[in-house]
Structures are given as structure tokens and as C-alpha cells.
Amino acid sequence: MYYENWISFRNEIKTATRCILIEIMAGIKSAKSALRKKMKDIITQLNTEEKQRQSMKVFDKLCSLPQFRESTRISLYLSTKDEIDTIEILKYIFERKKIVFIPRYKGKEMEMVKLFSMQDYETLPLTKWNIKQPNVNELRENALQTGGLDLILIPGVAFTANGKRLGHGMGYYDKFLDLCLKKQQKIPHLIALAFNEQLCEDIPTSENDILLDLVLTEK
């Protein structure tokens, strides 16, 4: 009888704990959604000139970083109009004879594949998100299969000064970074590029969220 009561009590505890965790996760998800909407509204209000001004300042600061200068294999996102513009960074990488890998989205997964030149960039097709990427059926060198990455430059919706990141909600970078850290012996530098307005005091996070090494803004 005692044993049966103990089993029943233990199951009740497990159920209650599971319910609490579900409520916590639902609260985090709701808070993230609200912050995404707020930040996207703020970034939308920035004019093109201000976005470009901040982008160039971030580019200048990036070029002075040892983590960037000493890296050979670099992952770089191809920016949208509401992100720090990465076109000058891309040109600089090719000028310095570094190797660049860009995101290619396949369903719910993202891989980093090699980009060969600015001419290669110009010929890339657009996705439904209006982002350039190589065709999913095209054979390209995969960064994690050919030596890994030294540096990953990361986009996002919001950040904190100590490296917390809020993405767009699809989990592409979260899953990729997790895979990258498992596959590589050497941990790559993780640097976010952001507008001043994207910095927050805090961001709701879960245990699976990975902290960045640096959030680079104009300031």
C-alpha cells in the first residue's frame, strides 16, 4: 500500500512539474513574440540613410577586431533591409582572400555553404524572404564538413550587451550553432552585428539559447 501511494505521489509531482515547465515556456515564447514585434516596429522607423550610416560604422569597427582579422573561414549572413548591411563586409572578405560561407535554408534547417566571389553573389537567386542564397540542389562546399568556421557573424532582432540574442523565431541559428559547437573542436567566435536600437537591457531566454561573444554596434 505504501509503495502504491509513493508511486502515485511521484507521478503527481512529475505531472505538476511538467505543467509548470509548460507554463514557463509559454510565457517565454509570448514575451519573445511581443519583443520581436516591438523591435521590428522600431527598426522599420529608421530611414535608409541612418541604417547605412550605422552599417558603415559597424563595418569599420569589425575590421579592427582581432577576431575578424585573424579569422580565415568566416560565416556571413546576407542582409535584408532591416539588418546591418553586410555587402561591404563581403567585399572586404574577398579582398583579403578569406573564405566566406553564407546561409542556405532547406526546410527547417540551415547550412553554411561557400560563396566564391562577388560575381557569384550577384547571380544568386532570391528566396521567398527576399534573401539571396544558392539553389538548394546546387552542390557547394559545406563549412562544417570541410574544416569548420573561425568566425560566425550573426543577425537577429534584438540583443543585450552581454550576448543574449533574440532571433526571428524560426530557430535556424540556434540549431546551427548547436550543431557547430558539437562538430568543431575549436569553438568559433560568435559576433552579432546590430543597430543601436536593437540593444535591450534584457531578453527572455531559454536554456537552449547560446550566448554570443560580442554584440557589435556603432556605439
What label would you give each PLM region?
Residues 169:
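Short polar/charged helix/loop
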